[in-house]
Amino acid sequence: MGEIQKITVKNPIVEMDGDEMTRIIWQFIKDKLILPYLNVDLKYYDLGIEYRDKTDDKVTTDAAEAILQYGVGVKCATITPDEARVKEFNLKKMWLSPNGTLRNVIGGTVFREPIVIDNIPRIVPSWEKPIIIGRHAFGDQYKATDVVIPAAGDLKLVFKPKDGGEVQEFPVYQFDGPGVALSMYNTDASITDFAESSFQLAIERKLNLFSSTKNTILKKYDGKFKDIFEGLYASKYKTKMDELGIWYEHRLIDDMVAQMLKSKGGYIIAMKNYDGDVQSDIVAQGFGSLGLMTSVLVTPDGKAFESEAAHGTVTRHYRQHQQGKETSTNSIASIYAWTRGLIQRGKLDDTPEVVKFAEELEKAVIETVSKDNIMTKDLALTQGKTDRSSYVTTEEFIDGVANRLNKNLGY
């Protein structure tokens, strides 16, 4: 084995550590798959629950500001505390989701993409190529005002212009008795950012782009999404997409999900907040596993980018680890959190050797499973295998990836 020639990463990467089993995996990945091959300045932020509590969650906003400063961040999975976690860690308060905090500071769109491995059976067998779900992570149900209507009466929506113009009233419903009501919103600026990010990813990945709404029912609300996407396509992106042989199309959400099931994959769907939330999990499971899903947050100007695994901290395995028992935890999505960040860093820095290394690492991950038949328990189970010899431990899998990477790189 020849000596490893380290590649230098020109600019820093923001590294955000996490919790429980994923924190252990994160360290293995860094020690075995990143640092032996790269000279990289990692700006380290500990987003583990104890340190977030110690800093009153300031560490999370500091990490977000650092991503805005340096352009690229990679994040380990983190605990979002509930009542039980507050008690378990004796927390000062129930801190917000770190992902939510990062999104609020950075802005941008969340794109979730499945990792496709040939020998992992798919629940939807026709899906050969990835389906990327772009989720508009602003407004709608997630920032709505929902109320319980106590008795009969009139419900109205009132708009009061800031410039002192005429107040507008919109009758909503005449209640004969108790019920519920909901008022939600979105903004042209946020929808435009969402559309820009979606078109840019389509061009970068050379994939067709769909957007989906229910504009036949919500003619003005969903119509606004449709109009903004179509306006940008015509004025800014159609020529470039034509050159690449790709296109954009709006589809009704019900038609879109039906077409999705019949298709072979290989496209992007830009979805409203709720639709994207639901469909990204359906897509992940359809491709075989929630453990095979990448998640990136990207701003429309491309200046801020954050990648992470689209799963939690794997508490159940961590409890086994704490008891000294062996674990077989899937680290693939966490490895991809690093590789997607490195690819973005390499593109921004114009260092193709960094991009090439990250792509080689992704290839090594896939081949460890598909060629070497080395996999964790969850992947073995998808093949109907339950015997102990069919899977390896958490650390053995990462060692397997390192061996495959060295073989492919000629070390």
Swiss-Prot record:
NADP(+) binds at T78, I79, T80, R85, K262, G312, T313, V314, T315, R316, H317, N330. The keyword Cell inner membrane does not apply. It is found in: Peroxisome. SUPFAM superfamilies: Isocitrate/Isopropylmalate dehydrogenase-like (SSF53659). Its EC number is 1.1.1.42. It catalyses: D-threo-isocitrate + NADP(+) = 2-oxoglutarate + CO2 + NADPH. Binds 1 Mg(2+) or Mn(2+) ion per subunit. Gene3D superfamilies: Isopropylmalate Dehydrogenase. One of its GO terms (molecular function) is NAD binding. InterPro entries: IsoCit/isopropylmalate_DH_CS, Isocitrate_DH_NADP, IsoPropMal-DH-like_dom. The keyword Nucleus does not apply. The record marks Y142, K214 as: Critical for catalysis. Mn(2+) binds at D254, D277. Substrate binds at T80, S97, P98, N99, G100, T101, L102, R103, R112, R135. Its cofactor is Mg(2+); Mn(2+). GO terms for cellular component: mitochondrion; peroxisome. PROSITE patterns: IDH_IMDH. Induction: By N-alkanes. GO terms for biological process: glyoxylate cycle; isocitrate metabolic process; NADP metabolic process; tricarboxylic acid cycle. Keywords: Glyoxylate bypass, Magnesium, Manganese, Metal-binding, NADP, Oxidoreductase, Peroxisome, Tricarboxylic acid cycle. NCBIfam families: nadp_idh_euk, PRK08299.1. May play a role in N-alkane metabolism, glutamate synthesis, and/or NADPH generation in the peroxisomes. Belongs to the isocitrate and isopropylmalate dehydrogenases family. This is Isocitrate dehydrogenase [NADP] peroxisomal. It comes from Candida tropicalis. The gene is IDP2.
